[in-house]
């Protein structure tokens, strides 16, 4: 199977599993918004965002390094060396974090200290096991594990939030147990002990892996800072209720991020494997064209359908979130395209540029938030995120020319439709929204028809085997 078909197959297999977690996220929205006040949900969302900020610091993203180095590992001995070094470093990092966090939160007498620490440890374990499954080529196991994660999250959330009425701590406990159980299943299926041995620990390999992963940390942290600064400053300047509304508004644009995530997981591997191929420029351009059309279709489709589905998922106390969704949807588009460019930088093992661009964007995001949130509230947070993501997109696009030239063609029809869709969205006239949705649907199908055909054949053949 050629590289492009393999990428499509892996993307779909990953999507089948990961889609369950996104479906879960939306199935649970009515539960969250009915059982938790905007202030409570804002607190939970802040803790989740804080955990994503701490994770790269604790692990130095060694799981990402492990995945990349496993792609180049030609024999079992090389794989054992990479995996052993990763696990050894992760265990040390986790122990140090637990000790420091336990002391700090113990002194502060923070209400959610214990479960929050366990929540972070469970995320470390899950990230490590997922990277191991992907790196060893067990894509179906990776996909299946995400399905297990989604199903267990539903059950546990109902138990902890509805039956036990534990509120914010219940959400944290549910996710902690689901993450841990899923990670254990993956590690048992992979027979982890066969890949880990004290004699296979090599400092030289560890240093090489850290040289790859450490520059990724500022990149990841900066993306998180863009999100965290919004939430932190909204909480400080406008209250936890405003943060809760902003968090719900972000739930819908995250559909796009999740859809791209299906592709991105497979793309990092594919972009690296084809690097030595003479046809890599043609391959990159072909994928670039397809992913742009696909993401633009989702942007238009999500904005067009939102007037009809928003009230089905969200309690009326969160109605203000409706106004910010289009801004965040467009912002996520630029995030995803920046990540696409990042996949190429990763293939060339140039991770430094990824960090420098996002650090600059994070600083701009913070400055905008400080200046404008006191006056414009959630709108300021939304636009600061859009501006920051756009800056990363433009700069990475410029720097990419040093490695590869991607062909560009301005899509006038898309931008005209986007403006028209935004007008009907905010006018919120039923007839106009219906007409606009039909037009957008036709456009999305027409522009992605060949892409959908490319997906269907290899995926069907893969599962027949």
Q: Each PLM stretch: what is its role?
A:
Residues 1-3, 114, 140, 164, ...:
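Interhelical loop/hinge segments that connect adjacent transmembrane helices in multipass membrane
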Residues 58-59, 64, 84-115, 184-185, ...:
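Alpha-helical transmembrane segments of multi-pass membrane transport and lipid-handling proteins
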Residues 69, 123-146, 329-360, 400-402:
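Membrane-interface junctions at transmembrane-helix termini in multi-pass inner-membrane proteins
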Residues 425-465:
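Membrane-proximal transmembrane or re-entrant/amphipathic helices at the cytosolic face
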């Amino acid at each position: 199977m050629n590289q492009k078909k393999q990428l499509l197959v892996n993307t779909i297999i990953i999507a089948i599993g990961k889609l369950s977690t996104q479906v879960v996220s939306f199935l649970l929205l009515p539960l969250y918004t009915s059982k938790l006040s905007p202030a409570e949900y804002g607190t939970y969302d802040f803790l989740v965002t804080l955990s994503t900020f701490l994770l790269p610091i604790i692990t130095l993203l060694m799981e990402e390094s492990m995945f990349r180095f496993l792609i180049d590992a030609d024999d079992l001995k090389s794989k054992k060396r990479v995996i052993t070094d990763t696990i050894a470093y992760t265990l040390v990092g986790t122990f140090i974090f637990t000790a420091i966090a336990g002391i700090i939160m113990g002194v502060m007498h923070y209400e959610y200290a214990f479960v929050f620490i366990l929540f972070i440890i469970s995320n470390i374990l899950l990230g490590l096991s997922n990277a191991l499954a992907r790196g060893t080529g067990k894509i179906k196991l990776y996909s299946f594990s995400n399905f297990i994660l989604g199903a267990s999250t539903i059950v546990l959330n109902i138990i902890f939030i509805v039956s036990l009425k534990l509120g914010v701590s219940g959400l944290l406990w549910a996710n902690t147990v689901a993450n841990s159980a899923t990670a254990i299943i993956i590690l048992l299926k992979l027979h982890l002990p066969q890949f880990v041995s004290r004699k296979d620990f090599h400092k030289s390999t560890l240093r090489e892996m850290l040289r790859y992963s450490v520059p990724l940390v500022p990149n990841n942290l900066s993306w998180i800072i863009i999100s965290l600064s919004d939430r932190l400053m909204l909480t400080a300047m406008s209250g936890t209720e405003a943060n809760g509304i902003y968090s719900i508004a972000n739930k819908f644009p995250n559909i796009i991020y999740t859809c791209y995530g299906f592709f991105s997981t497979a793309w990092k591997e594919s972009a690296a494997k084809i690097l030595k191929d003479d046809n890599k420029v043609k391959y990159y351009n072909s994928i670039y064209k397809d992913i742009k059309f696909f993401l633009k279709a989702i942007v238009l489709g999500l904005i067009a359908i939102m007037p009809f589905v928003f009230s089905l998922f969200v309690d009326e106390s969160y109605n203000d979130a409706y106004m910010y969704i289009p801004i965040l949807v467009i912002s996520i588009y630029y995030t995803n395209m920046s990540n696409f460019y990042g996949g190429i930088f990763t293939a060339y093992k140039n991770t430094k540029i990824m960090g420098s661009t996002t650090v600059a964007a994070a600083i701009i995001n913070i400055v905008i938030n400080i200046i404008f949130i006191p006056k414009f509230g959630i709108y300021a947070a939304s636009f600061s995120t859009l501006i920051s993501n756009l800056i990363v997109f433009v700069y990475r696009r410029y720097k990419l020319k040093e490695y590869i030239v991607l062909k560009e063609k301005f899509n006038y029809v898309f931008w005209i439709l986007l403006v028209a869709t935004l007008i009907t969205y905010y006018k919120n006239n039923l007839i106009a929204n219906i007409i606009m949705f039909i037009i957008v649907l036709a456009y999305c199908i027409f522009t992605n028809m060949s892409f959908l055909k490319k997906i269907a054949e290899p995926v069907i053949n893969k599962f027949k085997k």
